[in-house]
Amino acid sequence: MFGMRSRHHGGLWRCESVFMWAAIVVALAQSASAQDRKLYLERSAFDVIVLKRDGSRHEIMPLKSRSAEVKRTGSLKVRLMSDTAEEKVISWAEIERIDLFEIMLLAEANRFVVAKKFNEAFKAYNLLLQAYPKTPGLDPAIQTFLFINAEHFVAEGQWNLAISTLEELFDRNPGFQRGGKSVFSLLSDVVSLILEDLIVNKKDFPSARQMIVRLDLKYGSGDRRLAATDKWRGSLVSLAQTKMAALKQLIDKKEFLAARNVSADMMMIWPDLDGARELAEGTVRSYPIAVVGVTQRVNTPDPLKIDDWAARRAGRLTERSLVEFVSPSPEGGYYTSPFGSVEKSDDYRHLYFQLRANSRGVRLSSYELGDWLLAMADPDGPHYRKRWAAVAERVEVEDDTRIRVDLRKADVLPEGRLRVLLSSYPPLAEHVASMRPYSIKENTEEHVRFVRNPTAISQGVNPPAELYERFYANFDKALEDLRYGRIDILDRLFPADTAKLLEDGAADVVVKPYALPTVHFLALNKDRHAYLKNNAFRQALIRTIPREIILDRLLDGRTLSGCRVISAPIPAGRSMNDTLAYAYNENIKTRRYDNGIGRIMMSVAKGQFEDIAKKKKEDPPALLPLTLAHPEDKIARFACQIIADQFELIGVECVLKQLGKGMTDDPQRNYDLLYVAATISEPVVDIERLVGRDGIGRTDDQYVNYYVRRIAEATSWRDIRRHFESLHQTISSDVTVIPLWQLTEYYAHRPGIYGLDDNVVNLYQNIDNWVLNPNPSDFE
């Protein structure tokens, strides 16, 4: 509490020197001023001499000697505070006494305490400690202040302040007493109040346990042992014993999900309970269950749905693709297949599949896969895939484990065209069943329960038997439950929480990045709102959105690598050297927020509509309210509310429409603007689904559609980058969508869970390798 450097003391001794008194008494009488009425705390240091003749008080610059016991013979020189330039002389015989500044300040500090002005008292005592530590009576006065201040904190319910104050007093004087109450007894009372609040009211068992352990280390021996810690330690042990008994019953009944939760509670309450560790570890080994906190609910799992975070996440559990994106690479991404490996030739003219047997010795035959590849190239068949048919020329079975596909022309990413769900090809149903690791057992408003498929093939030792996704509408609550062990993993962090956790280096939470950012933009439905067909109107909208400000608020004023405003809905990567940024054109600058320009462009748009109407001799179209649809997640809600408010400033009414549970789009397109957060793993492959004719941000702009087509047809990376530059320029100039920002994404888990990697594309990408550990250190 005390010990910080006081501003009031800076340069105090520079003004001091030894003076010999030689002044005229009459001159001293002229030094009194209105300064007397100011608090000593608010003034520069000075001493006071009191004259015998009339008892008058006169302020002088501080004496060098700070002792009241000085030789009172002869005369002294002094400089009056009212006239420091001239030395005055006075005989000691004329002086009744000298009041030193620190004595006066101490008396004032004591008066502050009596008046319960504790902030002022603290400042005064702290100044005395810094500048005048040898002031007589200072330490006893501070002890009294600390005790009275602690009593005040207790009365106000500010128990944490009370305990820190009492601990400081205890460190100064363990035997301090006042009014029949000792510092130790009051400390024990306050500790009991805090522990009761933590245990009974807040159920914050880790904080209570940590407090007991800390206080035991400090006061836990002999007469210094706190009765409160003994009492509440016993309560925690008793609660943990109750949980242990319940856990054993649940295990006997094979109610494993409930057992997992009770086990977590037991370990959170008192992990050192005899037998607790062994029982918790046995529970996990026999039937491991992972509880994942999610902030976006899943509607229909789909690992390929780029605009639906929850669908992609859950889709990895219930669906697999023929070819899967694993991670970014310098030229496109790395791909693999559940059936084996897939790679292209150096000249981009051939694609090879090498099939392998699973852990049970079962392997898809090359003939079965070959039939599917041919079926996807057959325009008359039910499994036709236009993008695959455009490049596949011939399928050759080289042997029972290897297939070669000859391409019509060079194609830089032919494997990307085969991200097709296994379930879309029924002839492989027998093989597909073993590829789906989990199925949905329950799906409610609050949770989704996944259970391991009995036929699923695992590459890991003991993957989760069940996975329980718990929905949180509140990021803060989700993070709290992660810290307390109520959930094992939080699948997505709010940007500000990510930045804070990384800055703080929190030991109780492990934060890891995803490989891919999300790009956020507003898709336009021009068919529904006439004004959206006007470029000037779209320019007005983008100029009116304070994208930098919204992003800053999402980050709570912090910085996070890769989070930035963008000029097109294309991944910009975390840095200029990020391989994922190959499609982004850094030469195109983002339009900065300028409400003035927004108003001007709004006037231009209205003028253009009026001119057209005048030529047609009809009324111009009415400016109807814009309907801005958005998913239910916090980021979208937060951003869209600000955007809607900003549109009002240029005279555009905006109505917000929250989509249903787990929805990221409205199939009926009953909106004018749609907030989209897309995860683009491979721009070459995904751009068509993003802004193509049937994409999320589809447009009738012929140039956009032209460049999307040219990208799909490109035969070299050079051509791809060139076409992306042109596409980027077109999207930016014509505002075919309203780009917002890019967010780098992170997830978090409690310590003690293994197999969760950095830079995964999907949280469940390596779920077979997860190892759950209930070690109590997870919660410390």
Where does each model-flagged region fall?
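Extracytoplasmic/peripheral linker and loop segments enriched in polar/acidic and small residues
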Residues: 248, 264, 268, 272-274, ...
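Long beta-strand-rich cores associated with HINT superfamily self-processing modules
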Residues: 749-780
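Ligand-site clamp/hinge motif
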Residues: 356-359, 375, 455-500, 655
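Periplasmic binding protein-like
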Residues: 482, 648-694
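Gly/Pro-rich hinge or "lid" segments in bacterial periplasmic/extracellular proteins
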Residues: 313-314, 320, 327-329, 400, ...
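Structural transition elements
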Residues: 561-611, 630-638
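N-terminal lobe/hinge region of extracytoplasmic solute-binding protein
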Residues: 293-346, 374, 433
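Surface-exposed binding/hinge segments that line
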Residues: 354, 361-362, 384-428
